[in-house]
Each structure stands twice: as C-alpha cells, then as structure tokens.
C-alpha cells in the first residue's frame, strides 16, 4: 500500500486545512502527520483560502480539507470554483452539530446542496483508519478532473473541425484594408499635414495577376477614396476660412501712396503727425514719385496753419491752400475750422473751450516751432491730459463739466447723511472724493464713523474738513476726525470724615467733557434688539410641550390592544382607559403628559409615579 501511495505522491500528500477551530486544526494536523500527510497551510475562512490559492506565492497543494460550515458562511460554492479552475480536490469536513449550531432557511438549503454535490465527506474528529485511505480518493478525483478537461478540449476541437468541413455554413468576407499614414512635407509650400492612402486588396495580395472578382473589389476602395477626399476638402476649406479671419489687417502705414508721399513733406522724425512705418527719401518709390531724383520734391502740402489774434485767441485752420490765411475767431474762444476754402463759412464747426486751453495755446513760444516749408509753420503744444471720471485718482474735471457739477466749498458744512421716511438716503460728498475713502477715514485714526441710521446731528459730530491743527490740505477725507479732547488733571483729595480715609474726585472739566461726549454706538447695531436678546438669556425654566419636541409623526407612548373585559377592569383600576365597554387602546404608563417636565437642558425628568414604580 505504501508503494502505491508513493507511486502517486512521491513527496507525500500536501494538504490545506480551512477551519476556525484551533483545537480541531491541531488535532487534524497531528493525525495527518502520522500518516505522512504534510499540512502546508491553514486558513479560517473559505475566502481567505481561495485568495491564498489565487495569489502569486502559491505553494503546491494536492488536497483541501474544508469545514462545510465555513463554505455556508462564505456564500459561494467553494468546491466547484476550486476544482473547475485550479483542479484541486476539495474534501468537506462535517462536525456533529449542536442544537444552537443548527442552520435553517436558505442556509439549510445551501448546506444540503453542498453535501449532495460534495466529492467526499469526512466526519470530525478525523479517524486515522479513514484518513489512511484518503490518498486514493484524492488520486481518483485528480484523474477525473484531468480527463474532464481533456474531453472538453476535444469537444471544442471537434466542433471547430466540423465547421471547417462545411463550407456552406461559414462565410468568410475579405475586405480591402485602408492604411492611413500622417506625413509632413519637407519641401516648400504649405506645411499642413496630408494623408497618404494605401489601398491593399486582400484578394489579390497573394497573386500578382489581379484576376478574380475585379469589379466588386475595385468598387469598394474607390468609394472609400472618394469619401476621404471629400472630407479632406471640407477640412481644408474650413481651415482656409479660419486663417483668413485671423490674418493681420492692413494698416495705413503699409499703403504704397503714403510710403511715396511722406518723404516729400520733409517732416521731422519727432513730429507726432508722422505715421510709423514710413520710408525715407532714398526709397525707390519716393524717387519714382519725385521724378527719379532723391532730392526734395517741389510739391508743398501744408499740414495745418495756426495764427494768434490780438485778443488772445488761437485759430487753427485745415485747408488745401498752400499760403496761410487769416481767419477771424470769435472773442475769447478758440475755433478749429475744417474747410477747403479761404473764407470760413458760418456753418463751420466751432469748438469752444475755457480759458485753460486758451492760456496753454498762448504760452507756446514761436521759437520752438519747426519749419516744414517756406509758408508752413508748426508749433509744439504741451500735451493735455485726458480725464474721464470725477474721482481723485482720475484728475481734475474737464472745463466743459464745470457748469454741470456743483463743487462743495472747503468751508461748507461737514458731510451729512440724511434719511427721510419713504425716500432713499442722500449722502452729500465733495466732488472728486470716493465714498469708500470717506468711510475708511472715519475709523483710520481710532474714531467711529456715524452709523447709517444716525441723525443729522450725530453725523455732524464727525467733521473731516476745516481743521486748523491738521496741517493738511483743506477738504481731504483722510484727515483724522476732530473729536472731543480730554485732558488729564490732578485729582482732588476730599476728606470724608475722620478715620474714613480719602476719596478721589475728578476735575470739573473732565466730568463736563464726559457728559458732553456723544454716545457713539457701533454701526448697524440696533439697541432694542440687543436688549431683547439679553432679556431672553436671563430667562430660566423654559417649558415645552411633548408634542412640540417629538413632532406630529413620532409615537413615543406604546399602545396596547386589550380586550373588552380586560379594558373595563384596567379602566376601573387606573382610570386611564379610553373606552372600556367597547374595547380600545390603553396607555401603558400610569401617568399623563403633564407629569413629564422638560428642562432647559433638553432632559426628560419623570416623577416618582413612573411605570413599574408602584
């Protein structure tokens, strides 16, 4: 017998035990060791054993002894999975079950299924005589699993061979293959990507004659090629439109006419009227325009003319006449005339400015002018800044807005915030000062600004201008507010009788300053609401009803269904029955809802007459 076992298992039978009973595992290991069965691994659950068998570090195992109750608790057929996938025989261990260990329901049905389909079942504790013949069961099961796998392979191969013999059932369709390859052109021209299409006909790949079904095979690649060509055309058209949309627009300096005419004007390079990108007098286009010579052309085109009148006015005239012409401007105004005649008509556009623009134009010296030609003279005027907004960082207002904005004088009353019932609050601020700077300035130097709901008198207590000791410009919002000043005086010691000690009395001026100091509440603070919150915090013994705490859908009190005679007896004893004669629901506790007190800590405090206390 030993020789037969050694012929099947030369290195001995290697076994895995799956059981959570440590005592049973030690006993089984000792029994199997006497029979030269090596226990190489033990696990407490079927899932852990399956994970170990499916891992990377798998030891050679020839049989698995598994407690059937561990398979029931795992929820899957451990034997079927292991034997079909790993081809390792699984033998179930069945122990004597106590009454508390009995299974029922679906677990009982699953246990019966496992026992009916089991390969071999051994009762616990293990019998050495029975385990001595275990190697025969393992060898026979391994042989059956190998034969079953070979039969399945042969069956699949036979099914495939029959299909190969029957040419009518199998239809093999060979379609031409289209290979796409993305390449980049190295030569000149467009550097866009193009598709190289290689059409290969599988039917003619083996033979070079190209015979057999040429019409049908050639039609498919043609349609594919046409389809791809149309898609490429749409792609190129779309990208051409996109490229045209993002092209650089033609600027005025690129005009050939300007490149040819600008060198003949002899304009200084620092002239602001000279366009960027113009070419010099040595240009070929300029020489062709000037008659083939690089010298100055006799054509003289005046750019603009300017004359100063005796009454302090400035006249700027744009015309096509080469000689300067005198135009009479209105009194104390500046006129800009755009016309093509020597005399200014009545309908010319007249743009009037205040004396600021006039003085800027009058102060330009004639010595700074640059001569363009014998009859044209240009004066360099100081550039005026352009202002767009009324705030301080945007500069002073333009002269045209002086008549539309009323500035508050520096010696005016401080900023006030008035609010009438039913109207939007009106805030008066000096011109050019942002509101946010005003709000920040009220708290920058430690003072509290007036609240939104403050009266006019309270807001007037925070002056921000006309402070003689501030040493800053009048009207600045960042000046610290002028609040009541307090002075520290020497305390006056007043005797309060013999042996009673001394008391400290503040000075009269300090008392008066404290009395006269306004009470500045914090902004957006409602005193009535603060007082109401403080009153609510002082209250104690807050009472709530049970319905308000539990909600309408919560049923705390258990209801008991009693019969008619029991209901009558219970009603006489406790006085709590709803309807003793007809039967109904009775409250199980001998207390009412008024006996339950809810304190402010949300804890239920019951009286001594709770259920069962009597």
Swiss-Prot record:
One of its GO terms (biological process) is regulation of DNA-templated transcription. Residues 200-220 are annotated as: Disordered. Residues 205-217 have a biased composition (Gly residues). The modification 4-aspartylphosphate is found at residue 67. GO terms for cellular component: cytosol; nucleus; protein-DNA complex. Residues 14-139 form the Response regulatory domain. It is found in: Nucleus. InterPro entries: ARR-like, CheY-like_superfamily, Sig_transdc_resp-reg_receiver. GO terms for molecular function: phosphorelay response regulator activity; transcription cis-regulatory region binding. Disruption phenotype: Low fertility. Keywords: Activator, Cytokinin signaling pathway, Nucleus, Phosphoprotein, Two-component regulatory system. Two-component system major event consists of a His-to-Asp phosphorelay between a sensor histidine kinase (HK) and a response regulator (RR). In plants, the His-to-Asp phosphorelay involves an additional intermediate named Histidine-containing phosphotransfer protein (HPt). This multistep phosphorelay consists of a His-Asp-His-Asp sequential transfer of a phosphate group between first a His and an Asp of the HK protein, followed by the transfer to a conserved His of the HPt protein and finally the transfer to an Asp in the receiver domain of the RR protein. PROSITE patterns: RESPONSE_REGULATORY (PS50110). PANTHER family: TWO-COMPONENT RESPONSE REGULATOR, TWO-COMPONENT RESPONSE REGULATOR ARR14. Belongs to the ARR family. Type-B subfamily. Functions as a response regulator involved in His-to-Asp phosphorelay signal transduction system. Phosphorylation of the Asp residue in the receiver domain activates the ability of the protein to promote the transcription of target genes. May directly activate some type-A response regulators in response to cytokinins. This is Two-component response regulator ORR33. It comes from Oryza sativa subsp. japonica (Rice).
């Amino acid at each position: 017998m030993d020789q037969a076992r050694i012929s099947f298992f030369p290195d001995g039978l290697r076994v895995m035990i799956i059981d959570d009973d440590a005592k049973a595992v030690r006993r089984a290991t000792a029994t199997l060791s006497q029979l030269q069965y090596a226990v190489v691994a033990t696990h407490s659950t079927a899932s852990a054993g399956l994970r170990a068998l499916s891992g990377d570090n798998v030891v050679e195992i020839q049989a698995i002894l598994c407690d059937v109750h561990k398979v029931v608790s795992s929820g899957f057929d451990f034997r079927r999975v292991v034997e079909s996938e790993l081809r390792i025989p699984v033998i179930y261990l069945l122990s004597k079950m106590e009454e508390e260990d009995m299974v029922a329901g679906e677990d009982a049905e699953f246990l019966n299924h496992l026992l009916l389909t089991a390969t071999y079942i051994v009762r616990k504790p293990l019998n050495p005589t029975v385990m001595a013949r275990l190697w025969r069961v393992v060898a026979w099961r391994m042989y059956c699993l190998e034969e079953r796998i070979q039969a399945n392979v042969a069956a699949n191969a036979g099914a495939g061979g029959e299909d190969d013999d029957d040419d009518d059932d199998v239809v093999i369709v060979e379609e031409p293959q289209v290979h796409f390859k993305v390449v980049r052109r190295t030569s000149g021209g467009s550097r866009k990507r193009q598709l190289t299409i290689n059409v290969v006909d599988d039917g003619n790949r083996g033979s070079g004659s190209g015979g057999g079904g040429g019409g049908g095979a050639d039609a498919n690649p043609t349609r594919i090629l046409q389809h791809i060509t149309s898609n490429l055309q749409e792609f190129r058209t779309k990208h051409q439109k996109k490229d045209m949309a993002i092209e650089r627009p033609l600027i005025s300096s690129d005009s050939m006419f300007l490149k040819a005419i600008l060198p003949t004007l002899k304009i200084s390079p620092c002239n602001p009227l000279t366009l960027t990108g113009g070419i010099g007098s040595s240009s070929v286009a300029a020489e062709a325009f000037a008659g083939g010579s690089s010298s100055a052309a006799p054509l003289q085109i005046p750019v603009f003319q300017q004359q100063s009148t005796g009454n302090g006015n400035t006249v700027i005239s744009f015309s096509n006449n080469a000689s300067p012409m005198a135009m009479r401007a209105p009194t104390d105004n500046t006129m800009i005339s755009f016309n093509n005649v020597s005399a200014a008509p009545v309908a010319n556009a007249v743009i009037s400015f205040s004396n600021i623009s006039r003085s800027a134009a009058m102060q330009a010296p004639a010595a700074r002018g640059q001569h363009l030609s014998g009859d044209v003279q240009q004066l360099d005027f100081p550039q005026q800044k352009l202002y767009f907004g009324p705030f301080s960082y945007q500069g002073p207002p333009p002269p045209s807005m002086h008549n539309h904005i009323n500035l508050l004088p520096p010696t005016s009353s401080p900023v006030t915030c008035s609010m009438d019932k039913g109207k939007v609050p009106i805030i008066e601020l000096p011109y050019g000062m942002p509101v946010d700077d005003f709000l920040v300035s009220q708290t920058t130097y430690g003072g509290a600004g007036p609240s939104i709901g403050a009266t006019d008198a309270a807001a007037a207590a925070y002056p921000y201008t006309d402070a003689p000791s501030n040493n800053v410009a009048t009207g600045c919002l960042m000046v610290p507010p002028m609040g009541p000043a307090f002075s520290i005086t020497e305390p006056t010691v007043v005797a309060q009788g013999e042996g009673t000690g001394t008391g400290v009395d503040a000075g009269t001026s300090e008392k008066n300053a404290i009395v006269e100091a306004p009470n500045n509440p914090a902004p957006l603070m409602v005193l009535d609401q603060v007082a109401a919150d403080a009153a609510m915090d002082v209250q104690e013994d807050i009472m709530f009803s049970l319905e308000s705490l539990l909600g309408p859908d919560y049923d705390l009190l258990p209801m008991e269904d009693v019969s008619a005679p029991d209901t009558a007896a219970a009603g006489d004893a406790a006085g709590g029955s709803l309807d003793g004669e007809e039967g109904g629901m009775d409250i199980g506790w001998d207390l009412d809802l008024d006996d339950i007190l809810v304190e402010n800590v949300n804890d239920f405090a019951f009286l001594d007459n709770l259920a069962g206390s009597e």
